[in-house]
Swiss-Prot record:
Subunit field text: Monomer.
Gene: glpT
CDD domains linked: MFS_GlpT
A single GO BP: glycerol transmembrane transport
Domain of life: Bacteria
Known role: Responsible for glycerol-3-phosphate uptake.
Keyword match Transmembrane helix: yes
Protein name: Glycerol-3-phosphate transporter
This protein's UniProt keywords: Cell inner membrane, Cell membrane, Glycerol metabolism, Membrane, Transmembrane, Transmembrane helix, Transport
NCBIfam families linked to this entry: 2A0104, glpT, PRK11273.1
Residue intervals on the Periplasmic side: 58-63, 113-120, 181-189, 283-287, 342-346, 410-414
Length: 452
């Protein structure tokens, strides 16, 4: 691996008296680094959409621009997986800021170089590149969280961290307005968020650290005395990419089930998000400002929803991620049916449905990522999360744009909703299968430990 990305070497252990205060201070500091670092990736993820109306005025068709934008999702799905495998053998302190600076550089290029927005092919290639660098955001955060927080704390910490993308996702339109006020140039949609992202990358590098051992601290399991079922000394050894795949990812049946469930969770998440402005306008006769508010509320309702979901998965369901997912996905399916069946002319009900769906859907998105981290040993965590993300983006995101779009063209909005609701029912079934499988695996490990 490129030598700048090499994991930081383990240091001699600090004196016992210093371990607790150092651990506490570093955990806060590192959390700020991965929270704002990851939020900043969202500054340069969806900001191209803000420039699209101006590109339509230049004569590009909406369909073509949609195709160019899909470059981000396609590249991101692959990259999250491949970069996940690379990040399991890299220092997250260097890895996360590097990806952020590269993604921002692509956006600066698109903002300042006239031919970069001159053709669909060029835009697709540049957005594909940006999407590729975007994949360097999640895996180092996942690696950091499994090394610095123990299993019992992780649901809460992952759910707070997961709000970063809702926080980051809401900021680009504000930066764009600021840029328009200062420069009166629509390219500000591309370069304003990019400048901010670079500043945050420097902040993240200053705050983040690699493993506890690289700071002279004991592994988290020892510090918190919280060992997972299958923890042993081998869990601290770094693994090769081939070992990670062949031993822990490909043969892991439960990981395959949650990866496929992820396709259907993403189908609903992006199906509602991407199509709500069109649906609310065409079917529910919403004005532009109302449908924009609905979109904003959907994103921001995800914050309390994710926090509640993480808290419930730790405290109410006692770490049973499958059961929590079933609970939230069942409720979100009901909310989607109400949203679809509600007749035009009741805008309040539609707004409430958008808030409820946003509140409920981001929890399962977070849980599946967390669940993947826990189904694999911690040195394979990035690869496992990337594996489920690959399915989510390539299957779910692309299906949400293309399949839902074509279904609506041929069978009307009822057809589109049937696809999304059918998908979320399949997600519930798959999560029930995982729940049963986990219970069996847990009992088997207990038996081996007690009797074996």
């Amino acid at each position: 691996m490129l030598s700048i990305f090499k994991p930081a070497p383990h240091k001699a252990r600090l004196p016992a008296a210093e371990i607790d205060p150092t651990y506490r201070r570093l955990r806060w500091q590192i959390f700020l680094g991965i929270f704002f670092g990851y939020a900043a990736y969202y500054l340069v993820r969806k900001n191209f959409a803000l420039a699209m109306p101006y590109l339509v005025e230049q004569g590009f068709s909406r369909g073509d621009l949609g195709f160019a934008l899909s470059g981000i999702s396609i590249a991101y799905g692959f990259s999250k997986f491949i970069m996940g495998s690379v990040s399991d053998r890299s220092n997250p302190r260097v890895f996360l800021p590097a990806g952020l600076i590269l993604a921002a550089a692509v956006m600066l290029f698109m903002g300042f170089v006239p031919w970069a927005t001159s053709s669909i092919a060029v835009m697709f290639v540049l957005l594909f590149l940006c999407g590729w660098f975007q994949g360097m955001g999640w895996p180092p955060c996942g690696r950091t969280m499994v090394h610095w927080w123990s299993q019992k704390e992780r649901g809460g910490i992952v759910s707070v961290w997961n709000c970063a993308h809702n926080v980051g996702g809401g900021i680009p339109p504000l930066l764009f307005l600021l840029g328009m006020a200062w420069f009166n140039d629509w390219h500000a949609a591309l370069y304003m968020p990019a400048f901010c992202a670079i500043l945050v990358a420097l902040f993240a590098f200053a705050m983040m650290r690699d493993t506890p051992q690289s700071c002279g601290l004991p592994p988290i399991e020892e510090y918190k005395n919280d060992y997972p079922d299958d923890y042993n000394e081998k869990a601290e050894q770094e693994l090769t990419a081939k070992q990670i795949f062949m031993q822990y990812v490909l043969p892991n049946k439960l990981l395959w089930y949650i990866a496929i469930a992820n396709v259907f969770v993403y189908l609903l998440r992006y199906g509602i998000l991407d199509w709500s402005p069109t649906y609310l306008k065409e079917v529910k006769h919403f004005a532009l400002d109302k449908s924009s508010w609905a979109y904003f509320l959907y994103e921001y309702a995800g914050i309390p929803g994710t926090l509640l979901c993480g808290w419930m998965s730790d405290k109410v369901f006692r770490g049973n991620r499958g059961a929590t997912g079933v609970f939230f996905m069942t409720l979100v399916t009901i909310a989607t049916i109400v949203y679809w069946m509600n007749p035009a002319g009741n805008p309040t009900v539609d707004m409430i449905c958008m808030i409820v769906i946003g509140f409920l859907i981001y929890g399962p998105v977070m849980l599946i990522g967390l669940h993947a981290l826990e189904l694999a040993p911690k040195k394979a965590a990035g690869t496992a999360a990337g594996f489920t993300g690959l399915f989510g983006y390539l299957g779910g995101s692309v299906a949400a744009s293309a399949i839902v779009g074509y279904t609506v063209d041929f069978f009307g909005w009822d057809g589109g909703f049937m696809v999304m609701i059918g998908g979320s029912i399949l997600a519930v079934i798959l999560l029930i299968v995982v729940m049963i499988g986990e219970k069996r695996r847990h009992e088997q490990l207990l038996q081996e430990r007690n009797g074996g």
